[in-house]
């Protein structure tokens, strides 16, 4: 149970961090 919860937490973190990095990279590229 603990591994499943940590896996979903990691997946959620990846889904929130990845778009933020992508947006920041696009902003740097535009400037």
UniProtKB/Swiss-Prot annotation:
GO-annotated biological processes: photosynthesis
InterPro entries found in the cross-reference section: Cyt_b6/f_cplx_su6
Transmembrane segments: 3-23
Pfam family, one: PetL
GO cellular component, one term: chloroplast thylakoid membrane
Alphabetized GO MF terms: electron transporter, transferring electrons within cytochrome b6/f complex of photosystem II activity
SUPFAM superfamilies associated with the record: PetL subunit of the cytochrome b6f complex
Membrane topology annotation: Single-pass membrane protein
KW Transmembrane (keyword) present: yes
UniProt keyword terms in alphabetical order: Chloroplast, Electron transport, Membrane, Photosynthesis, Plastid, Thylakoid, Transmembrane, Transmembrane helix, Transport
Entry keyword Transmembrane helix: yes
Compartments, record wording: Plastid, Chloroplast thylakoid membrane
Self-association state and partner proteins as the record states: The 4 large subunits of the cytochrome b6-f complex are cytochrome b6, subunit IV (17 kDa polypeptide, PetD), cytochrome f and the Rieske protein, while the 4 small subunits are PetG, PetL, PetM and PetN. The complex functions as a dimer.
Family to which the UniProt record says this protein belongs: Belongs to the PetL family.
Chain's role: Component of the cytochrome b6-f complex, which mediates electron transfer between photosystem II (PSII) and photosystem I (PSI), cyclic electron flow around PSI, and state transitions. PetL is important for photoautotrophic growth as well as for electron transfer efficiency and stability of the cytochrome b6-f complex.
Name of the molecule in the record: Cytochrome b6-f complex subunit 6
């Amino acid at each position: 149970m603990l591994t499943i919860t940590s896996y979903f937490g990691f997946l959620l973190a990846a889904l929130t961090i990845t778009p933020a990095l992508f947006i920041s990279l696009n902003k740097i590229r535009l400037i």
